[in-house]
Amino acid sequence: MSIQFFSYDVGGLIVKEVRLLILWRRSALPNGRTLFARMTQALRIASSDKKYRSIFDRTSLLAFFATPHRSTQHQSPESVALALLNQCYCGLISPWISIFPPNFSKVVARSEVEFRPPTRAHILNVFQDPGPASPIKDSVVVHKSCAVLGVDGEVLIGLDCSHYTLARLLKARDKRYLLRQASHAALRHGKAFQQVVGLFFLDSIRTFDAEGPKFECRKVVSQLASLPQLQSWRQGSVDSRVLWFGTPAMLDPTSLFRTLRSQIQEENQLGDPIFIRVDSTLHRHNELSEPQILASMCQQILRQQPQLTSALQDLLLNVEDAAVGSRDCWKQRTLWNCLLVLLYHPKDAETFCFIDATSSLQTKNLAGQLESVMKESEMPLRLIVSCRSTAKQTPEASTQVDVDLSDAGFDEPLRQDLEEWIRESLECGLTDSTLREALLTQILSSGDFHLARHALEFFASTGSWLTKWSVPSVWAMLSKQSAAELFIEDNIRRHGQWLLIPMLWALEAFEPMQVDEIDVALMLEDNGVAGQVEDFINLLPGISTIRRGVFVIADHVRPAFDYLWGKYFATYQHHVYLAKSCVAALRHHLRVTPAIPQLREDKSSDAAARLCTYAAMNWVRHFSLQRNSETTKYVPHPTIITANETDPGSPNEHAGVSEAFLEDPELSRLWITHLRRALDLDGLDEELGHLILPETLGSRLGICTGWAIRISRQLASMRLSSERDVTNSLLVIGSETDDLAMVQSCLSADPSPTEHTLGYALAAASDPIKEKLLQQVGEPSDEFLYRALLSSICFGNVSVTEDLLVRITDKVRVAQVTPLEGSKLQWPQANESSESAETFRHTPLGVATAYGDADVIDLLINHDISWWDLEERSPPPGTWNALHHAALGGQRNIMCKLLLQQRKGVLNSSARIPNTVTESGNTPLILAASRGFHKIVALLLEDGSMRGYGVDVNIQNEQRSSALLAAARYGFSQTLEMLLTYEGIDYSKTDSNGASILHLALVNDREAAALQILAHKDIFSNEMEYQEANMEANSVNNFEDDDSFSESSVDTTDVVYTVPARPRISLHQKDGSGLTSLTIAIWRNLKSIVEILIAMDADANGPEGEFEAPLVAAAEVGSFELFTMFTKIGATKTEAALNTISTGRTRPLHAACAMGHLEVVRELLKDSVTQLSHTDSNQRTPLCAAISRDQNHVISVLLDRETETGLQEGLWEAARSGKAHILDQLLRRGAEINAQDEYGNTALQWASYYNKPRCVERLLLGGARLDLLDCDNVNALGDAARSGSAEPLKLLVDVGVDVNAEAGGDTALCRAIWAEEVECVSVLLQGGAKFILSSAQSRFENLLTFAVQVSSPEILRLLLKAPEERDLAPTLRSACAMQSTSQLEVLLEFYDPAKVDLGSGWTILHLAAVHGTLAGLTKVLDHATGRAALNYGPKKVGTPFEMAAFSSKESLSKVEHLYSNAALPGLVQPSSRFGTALNAASYRLNDPVVVYLLQKMQLEDINASGARYGNAIQNMLASAWMDTERSLKLLGILLEAGVSLTPTSADRHGTALHTAALFSPKPLVEKVIETSRMLADERDGEGRLPIHLSALQEEWASMMLLSTTTSTIRSVDKMGRNAVHLAAAAGARSVLEKIFEVEENEDLLLEADFDGWTPFHWACRGEDDDCARFLIEKARKIFDSKWDSMKHELVTTDEKTWTPLDVARFHQRREVELLLSLGMTTSDAENWMPDQSQNLGSYCDSCACQIWHEEHHSSALHCKKLYLRFNGWSRMCQLAPTAKRKYTPTLLGYKTCFKVADNLVKARLAKVLVPHSQGPLQRKGRGKGEGEEDEEGIATVENYPVSQSCGVEMIRAFVIDDRRIQPDATRNLNHEVSVGSEDQTQMSLGTGRLFVQSVDSPLEMVMDVAAIFLSSPKSAHKQDETTRAFATAK
């Protein structure tokens, strides 16, 4: 085991790497002491050594993996814990330490003195945490019980895996996997740490596994690190350096380099941390090509600086071609461009690259080129090149350091140590191949998998392994064994895994470095094989696997396959098992590689389809770098097949690449399909897919198998939509590969390819193909030539470029115009395609400059063509020109050439060109300065001086960064010096964060740059000078907003600048964070700079309101030297200074206490002890700050001086922080355990909320009260429940707290459910918590509904499992309406329809159909009970299909899904609301669903009607007011489909015109009338005409449309009502005004209906006072003198009739004017108060909806405008003969239900029944059966007539006149009323009423409700129900 500690620019990491060394020494793990000693060394160096203080300060994460172990074979937990305490952490106590050793206290004390832990860092602790059902059985355990450290900031991550798997987390070859897992885990647990740029692990040399040689290796490296050359390389902090070292053949350079890196880091004399990332794929036994090295360097840079991926967006045209094209020179060219962009892009940290150059002279020269490239910039880059060289052989390049371990002049002691090291490592006797063969034979025969793996790992480190060991030799070795077949079969059955690994290794199926990935893929465990034997048998053919993008089967593997297939799977195809063989291994690759795109789910069950899916994704992984939503391709194509089959790596060398694709076209099709999916491309049709098959291409083009496969792969990765696209692509491929035959074939197939294709092919063509293509073009256009020219420059095809230049020049000269004027060559506009915009984005000169082609630039300049001058074409603002490209790429020579040509006048550019800006606001000067190109900066500054104009050095880009600010930020000393001394520079410029050049240098740790800036003391000023200079500069020239330098300007006059007095920098200036330069320097602990700033009169005390006072910063940093420095210079420890609170941070004493700086604390407390009571901005005392960071040594000092108040504050902080040992100290010193802070929180509440079980336990034992509440009325139990503190909650429950008590309106269970804390809910349920919904959550129906809405499925399942009675009905309704289906799935597990009543015949399928989503509906249908209700529906509800059509959520999808599951779309239920699904969809105006249903339904079903509105058209018209336009469209659809305007239910609902008149706007009415004019004369079931309903809707325009000879305003319905009655009832004053404008209509004013109600009655019944007022005023005018007598009739109240006044009073009409008009005096009106209803509830006589509250108005919006039965349902038998109604009286909100069969109803009448016949109300005889009592005192009501107009509401009316009390009614109050049989009960239908009076005063008695039902009419249709009368009273 080993511990590595490494640091980098943003943090540090401690990682434990576990490795089982069982090759030759199968012993236990190394002693734990070694582990802890090494970790101690790293931590002590980081915490105490001044050299490494920056590393310690920046450490943000400590990661422990598998620490410590607990096993019967290893150390006990106690000893491990003691060692950990002694060697690593001080004062650490964990509950698993059961027995403390005798010397425990001494160890702790010694640890506290010797070591201070890095308390700032977060701790990530990974351990084993198997579940109760986990199959893991492991002897070595890393469990929570022994791995938890118990320190602050610790994040615990439990994994259900074996120790073997856990330990191997750090051995994964793809280190990004571990990085991703660590970062994700930390983020999931709420711990954010700084960005980790990479991971590196120190490991032993792979060649030698013994422990000794590893330390000898470190000895060698230690001597190597002490070499002067290496010291020089390490000390260069700014310049880019190259380190060369040669290694013997037996020494793995990668391993040596790893050890070297570690040694350099540990001995780093600089303050800057070093980080180096080595790609595991770099170690190869074959020679790397130049493109491979370039690609590897790009990968290494991007892994260290992942943010640089955005820099690749600006690459030019052929970036993608490098991955798809064929010519290596173009690949290399593009990769160079990518590498230069990454090298030169501004970076805030150093970058390291490693090259294993082996013995290739070519790669050594490449490294030399890189060194020269690096010298052009000041950007820091470290390049390490490893060369396996022979004696006297050095790299052929000029390098700064040459170190060759094999050189004769090499340091002799170092040589001796190295040779001894190698000799000792070979003493095992494996120096010769014979011994290796013998050992391998022995290992394979033994069946020991672990031994075989490590032996093969050892052998694979030598270069001769892959050639010496092959499949034939291994297979022959196995076949030599006796009974070979039996032997193999037996080993397959018993040890299926061990045989596969050697064969895979020997065949190079996987690289040797990937052995652990194979282990994981095969799911191997320590003690056995996981999986079925058949799985491993299927994996044996995995010897042939994915190899560089092509699936191949090597011929020398065929014998093995033939044997295995013949033995086990003779009846199956080969490729099927090849697919199975790769699935497991590839799955691991896909899991750990984030760059692989996610494929759509493949529904194919064929194994070959799975193979192609994984293979395609594996191929994409090789060349794609995922960047957000884009993919930048820069790695060369991985295919190893070349045109020349005799080349190395060709098919012939591999004994014939598999012809599986040609033999099986189906496999080829699958491969192409999944490859296109992996690239996110559209699929191909069958014909197009056939064209790109390898066999088709081979026969069409006459090419070999290898090329056919490769071209097929290229075509499969392109966007193809037609056969022409295939031909054009083949033309380009033929041009790229210089295949004239392919080009001719393509031109023959398509003689007229697109200009884009021809231009691309021409740019890539050689001379013969170029001539052929130019002949094909004929007379090319300027645009074609321009596109081809740009492409040829990108490809570096000089020959084509020169030819095109000649052609363009001739064309221009002949035309005598510039292409800008005479052709279509223009810059792309906004409406042009992105492809065109990208093509024309750069000029030819700019493209050539970007690629650094000096020859092409000369060619462009020397041609007499003016239109590529930098200004001639006047590109739009923000366009890059050649100077930008030269500055961006560090092309100094090209920059010189361009500037020189400008001076000569060859390039007719103006003086403003060097000041033009890109889209980001960058000038060439800013680009060069931000990349450290100091020579280019000097050129630009010098050129401006020579030409007589000034380069604007003060321009700032979008980020407000100028050239000077960029140089200061990145510490480019030479660039910075030039700019600081340049005339006209503005030193006071700041960036977007308000940082000056000095701020940037200090913030980015550029100490040298800061010193360089401070050396120019003349640029600094005091505050007054600073303000004056700024004012002067702003008044002279302010160029920031000046647009005179816009590139689009046509003014070419040179600009002469007026140089103002330059503003200087103030030392008091603050950046955007409020920090001064002095404060930043203190934070960085830069003492020398602090001294300089103080000497320059920087304010040591800081100005008033300073964000971070220097004294506070010094106290927090803990530098006693800095602190005393401030004391000496005058920053005295005055009370004001010490009490300074830096905004948002802390005081000096608080900062020192929190950081544990004891010396500073004592210094601060010398003179002012009162500081202990001061609080910071977080209201914490210094003691609290020390407790929060567990600074025990500071706490001891503070406790001796604390007051009682301070001790109390400390107690709360200790409880919050979980410091139990400090809690004990504070309680012993007198802190009150039950004290409450200002928010009412006690220590117990703090500990409970923050999950500190040890503190809770101590407080409970100390007698803490459980009933105390905080300011939110929450107790400790509620705090623990809502914060997820399960352990403290368990402690509280165990001590007996009431778990069902409410606190603050919530119970603990409700809080835990709301917080989604499963453990807490479980604890509470086990503790006896009941299913009680708290008062604060009363808006939910029950606890389960509350859990469904606010909590997780796990908690819901936990509640459902509890043995509590529960009602699932409301819970199911709530779950069905949710978007997520997780809660619904849980409920379905417990759903039993027999036990759950959803009401009114509803089923769960109905709920899901109307309220749920498609996913929820699918879940319900999949349930056992869901499908049972598919075509079932209650009468009033309808079927699920009907509900889905009515739904507003995914209605069409749900309808389609139900139909696919056998739902009947034509099912008709006339009694339901809509009747059919079509009607429901029409009402919802859901035209897609309507169209779908019309296609599925029969013609006879589409006209079916429902109970509410009628057929589909009527339902649509009923809701047309919501969307008129959509309704008109839907009406046309329904009419076209044959839906009738006169439905079968017209006798009940009327025609469609009735519905339109009542609900729809005028356009719909017009549309219906146009369709059928005759409908205006049709009547509905109540005799109403459409004009009646329009009057009710107050639509006068519609009434005019509906007027006919038989349909007028005088027409009456069956109740004798005309349009005036209905308009008055609806309050339609505008209609009444129109009607009474005609004098002939005045008689309608007093027209009475059959009940005797005039428009006055109906106006008083309505709600519009204006309408009643209008009628009264109109009556006064019409009747004039007769009005007084008429008015008396209107207000006279008697027992016979209801006057308008009665109606107004009953309906609470309070308008004084109306009442006065009805005959009341002024005094009576002022004192009159309406009768109150005593909160009586009942049913509305209009809509049967419940009525509540004092005023008798229905709560339903459609009460008036739907059924129009304003005065009661008492006439229902006559109005709607087919309808059946039941009325349920209510009393004070509680229903009293009566069954039909009941003949006796208990009631107490308050008034006799008053019978009458036609005419005035009269009383009949008073005999028995006529309303009197019988012998038993029971009154009968059989023969009493009931008024048609009184209705139910009149029965429940209150006494209006107390004087009309019948004296004989009192004796009937306590008697029952009997209801006669059907034959006996006959009620006349004349006008009359049933009236209720009071015995006493109406204000003293609460009246009861009486309701009466009418008998059926005298017709042939008799009702089934008898007429009943009900009456109730108290």
From Swiss-Prot:
Presence of the UniProt keyword Secreted in the record: no
Pathway linked to the protein: Mycotoxin biosynthesis
Alphabetical UniProt keywords: ANK repeat, Repeat
One Pfam family matching this protein: Ank_2
ANK repeats: 840-872, 878-908, 920-949, 959-989, 993-1023, 1073-1102, 1106-1135, 1144-1174, 1178-1205, 1206-1235, 1239-1268, 1272-1301, 1304-1333, 1339-1368, 1400-1429, 1514-1543, 1548-1577, 1615-1644, 1651-1680, 1696-1724
InterPro entries found in the cross-reference section: Ankyrin_rpt, Ankyrin_rpt-contain_sf, Multifunctional_ANK_Repeat, NPHP3-like_N
Gene3D superfamilies: Ankyrin repeat-containing domain
UniProt KW Transmembrane keyword: no
Note: Trichothecenes are sesquiterpenoid toxins that act by inhibiting protein biosynthesis.
Function: Ankyrin repeat domain-containing protein; part of the satratoxin SC1 cluster involved in the biosynthesis of satratoxins, trichothecene mycotoxins that are associated with human food poisonings. Satratoxins are suggested to be made by products of multiple gene clusters (SC1, SC2 and SC3) that encode 21 proteins in all, including polyketide synthases, acetyltransferases, and other enzymes expected to modify the trichothecene skeleton. SC1 encodes 10 proteins, SAT1 to SAT10.
Name by which UniProt lists this protein: Ankyrin repeat domain-containing protein SAT10
